[in-house]
Structure formats: C-alpha cells, structure tokens
C-alpha cells in the first residue's frame, strides 16, 4: 500500500505528483492493468515470448554497424 504524507502548506498538485511517481516506481499500475482481465496461461507465454524476440532483435540491431550508403 502506498502512503504519501502531505506536508504542511504543500499544494495538492505536488502531493499528487509525488503519489503518481511512487506508484509508477512500485509498478502498481502495470500490475493492475495486467490483472484487469484474465489472460490464459498460453496467451501469457505467447505474449512474453514475442516480447523477448522483439527485445532480442532490437539488441542485435543496436549492436550491428550500419551499412555504408554510397
């Protein structure tokens, strides 16, 4: 559970920004979105494998030298 103590004479917007930052850091929003709807285990594995392949190709693309354009 995320608790934010509002300091004296602190504007609401600043406190809200701190709250959002801590929630983002904890990963609560991503977990909430993932648990919003049930995802079958096979669909979850398929999604994670596709993400891993995408990361792999992205890493390879960043490591290779660009072709010379003549």
Curated annotation (Swiss-Prot):
Q: Molecular function terms in GO for this entry?
A: structural constituent of ribosome
Pfam annotation, one family = Ribosomal_S21
* Name of this protein: Small ribosomal subunit protein bS21A
Supply the InterPro entries for this chain. Answer: Ribosomal_bS21, Ribosomal_bS21_sf
Sorted alphabetically, the Gene Ontology cellular component annotations on this record are:
ribonucleoprotein complex; ribosome
Keyword Ribonucleoprotein part of the UniProt annotation? yes
Write out the similarity annotation: Belongs to the bacterial ribosomal protein bS21 family.
- Keywords annotated in UniProt: Ribonucleoprotein, Ribosomal protein
- Could you give a single Gene Ontology term from the biological process aspect? translation
